[in-house]
Amino acid sequence: LVVSGVPPQQAALVAKSTPIALDEPLPLPKFQNRDDVVAAIIRALDGIDSGFVEALIRREILASGIIKTWNEILVPALVTIGKRWEESGSGIEVEHLFSEIVKRIMRDCTNEIESPRNPKPVLLASIGEEHHCLAIHALAAALAEENIATHFLGARTPVDALAEMVRKTHPPVVFLWAQLTKNADYSAITSLPALRPAPRLILGGPGWQAAKAQGATMVDNLH
C-alpha cells in the first residue's frame, strides 16, 4: 500500500482491518528450471540473432510476467554469459548485446503503464559509480505490471542528485541498487532529506552489507 502511494496512517488502518494468519509466512514465488530456453538464448546470442532473442523474451513475458521471466531466464542467461567471460575472457560483445535487448524490452514494458495507482512514483537508481542497472530496469517493468509508476534515474546516480530528486518528488519508496561492494555508498542513507511521511528506503543487490545499512530495508531478490 505504501508503495502505491497510500499515506502510512491509512495503510496501517487497512492492514489492521485485514485478517491475516500471523503464523503463516508469505508464500515465496515458485520458479521453474528453464535451462532449455536459456540455452536457446545463448546460442542465438552467439549467432548475433538479436531478433530471435528479443522475440523469445517478449513471448515469455507475455506468458509468465516480468518476475518469472527475470528469475527463470534472464538471470541464468546473464550468469552463463558472465561465467564464460571469466573462464575464457571472451564474449563481452554478447553481454553488451544481451543487456541492450533486455533494457529495450523492459523500457517498453514500463512505458505501457497508463493509469498508475500511486499518485507519487517510486524512485529507482543505481548508486554512486554503479553502472549495472539491468535489475532496476526489470524492477521498473515489474512494478508497471502492477500499475505502479516509477522515476528511473539509472546508473551512476550521485547521492546529491538522489537527495534533490527525493526533495522534489516525495516518493513513497526509494530503491537503490549496488551490484559491487565498492559502489555501495552508505551516505545515501543519511543524506536523504527529512520528509513527512519519510520514504521507505530499500537497498537491493549484493553490494550492500546489512551491518552498515541501518535504517534501510535490504532485499536480495527481485520477487
How should each PLM-predicted stretch be described?
Residues 1-114:
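Long amphipathic alpha-helical segments
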Residues 88-223:
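C-terminal regulatory/effector modules of DNA-binding transcriptional regulators
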